[in-house]
């Protein structure tokens, strides 16, 4: 609810001397946000930000800003990443908070493009480097509801930042952030962790995402903890790199050099005649062949089922700090 240009129901702890929220409903109409957010973050991250930026022009409309959230490629001095945002925080709240510092070009909280689930971080691109630096100095570490946010410059994307986000299952249903830090923190600097919880009860689901600062740290954690029962746990953990959106998974369903359900016949295709199609070998299409084809169809069907029910995993974000 908005009253007099101030957003009510928010408990931000602002530094002393800062004004109230500069946002008002007349400043920006966020109802025109695209519904499909969180496109592929890997090689298509720049295109995603260009297509889905929330450019805030001087008149407050959705601007086609070329200085969009593009992983800091061209605006590393003005583009900020904000971590540890409250799960229910909205884009307009993020804008309202940072607008107290100065004019903003773009801002967005990153979400799953199908479910709208917040990943707990976002980007804010200021109009000037001075305002971006002042935002870090004034807003980094403040409490937003129950979260202490982290504000820093967005790092340029790079190959060295890939494979730093881990997907962990078989965790205890009573796992806490502190326990997760204890288990994984010894292998490197954890820059983000997110325990998935039941939306009705709030209890952990035994699944978490953990992002390390470096790929080597993530790989060390995988080597040390995958298929290992942690202290206080009852099941071996499954620890692997979180999949990127858009990555093909078809190859995992068919093992190479291993025919499924039945043997392929040994008939060979005949040679191509001059102008005529050669005949296939007589033993090529027999009952064994038909069984093999049926087996392949069943295998593909199961693969499609597995693919359709597989949960989309947190996409790669090259700017996660």
From Swiss-Prot:
Keywords linked to the UniProt accession: Nucleus, Repeat, RNA-binding
A biological process term (GO) from this entry: alternative mRNA splicing, via spliceosome
Tissue: Expressed in gonads and somatic tissues of both sexes. In the ovary, expressed in the last egg chamber of each ovariole. Highly expressed in nurse cells with low expression found in oocytes. Highly expressed in testis with lower expression in testis sheath and vas deferentia.
Stretches assigned to the RRM domain: 78-156, 164-244
Superkingdom of origin: Eukaryota
PANTHER family (alphabetical): OS02G0815200 PROTEIN (PTHR48025), RRM DOMAIN-CONTAINING PROTEIN (PTHR48025:SF1)
Protein's name according to its UniProt entry: Sex-lethal homolog
UniProt organism field: Megaselia scalaris (Humpbacked fly)
